[in-house]
Amino acid sequence: MPDLTPRTSNEDLTKWLTHPRYPRSNSYDPRWVVENQMGPNALWLLEWLAPALGLEALRPGARVLDLGCGRAMTSVFLAREYDAQVTAADLWIKPDDNAGRIAEAGFADRVQPVHAEAHDLPFAEGSFDAIVSVDAYQYFGTDDLYLPTLTRLLRPGGRIGVVVPALREEPQGLEPPEHLEPWWEPGYWCFHSADWWRRQWTRSGAVEVEAADWLDDGWRDWLLWCEVIAAESPEEWHRTMARQVGEMLRHDEGRALGFVRLVGRRKP
């Protein structure tokens, strides 16, 4: 890895983060993405989700809920890349904070930030053509009763798509994968396999599952991003977390950790 520091030029940072799998994301200011990240590279993950979710087929101005949007980078991406009218919902980032960032990006008329908790969403049934959630759904969506409530917000036939940190296989018993024990935290039990998620969504009866798959070499993308954030983030907490997660990913080498993509279509 190059010697990235807070003084690394945008040109060098752009070269390092340019990824052939994510051509749309490559067009965004890398410093803006680094400064506004809250975990794995959300733009990369959304770009991976988009084809399976059918975002390009949405009509101009389609209504999209970005659930757990963080600092609204994904919301800006949805408006810019897919001409969507986006509701950017988050619990932790204040709407005024996101509103400033959205306006600076030039999408104040297309992205509406709101403060909302995932179990108390202030929207009417059938309000959205699509729901997107990137690196957030694992924190509230493992509840077996949650998906039917959320998908009522979709028009009939509308799609929900999520990307979550995940495990390649479900652990057997009560212990985490042995090689990950030094880094394992209780919160990681919300990581599940693609099969686990497919089964949970299918059992809900709320959607027809159209995709539940694993990002090949996703751990490498995650590790690359951790290395950049550990060196470049302006926030010490994020630098520390990136170093810790990066150490775990290097040790794992894709044996257990990665990302799962899920897409479901609301049943009539």
Question: Where do the PLM segments sit?
Answer:
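Conserved alpha-helix/loop element of class I SAM-dependent methyltransferases that forms part
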Residues: 39-60
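Class I SAM-dependent methyltransferase SAM/SAH-binding core
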Residues: 65, 71-120
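A short acidic, Gly/Pro-enriched loop at the edge of an enzyme's catalytic core
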Residues: 119-130
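A short SAM/SAH-binding and catalytic strip from SAM-dependent methyltransferases
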Residues: 130-142
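A short glycine-rich, Lys/Arg-flanked "PGG" loop and its adjoining helix->strand segment in the class I
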Residues: 144-159
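Short, glycine-/aromatic-enriched active-site segment of Class I SAM-dependent methyltransferases
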Residues: 165-188
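Short alpha-helix
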Residues: 189-205
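Conserved Class I S-adenosyl-L-methionine
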Residues: 210-268
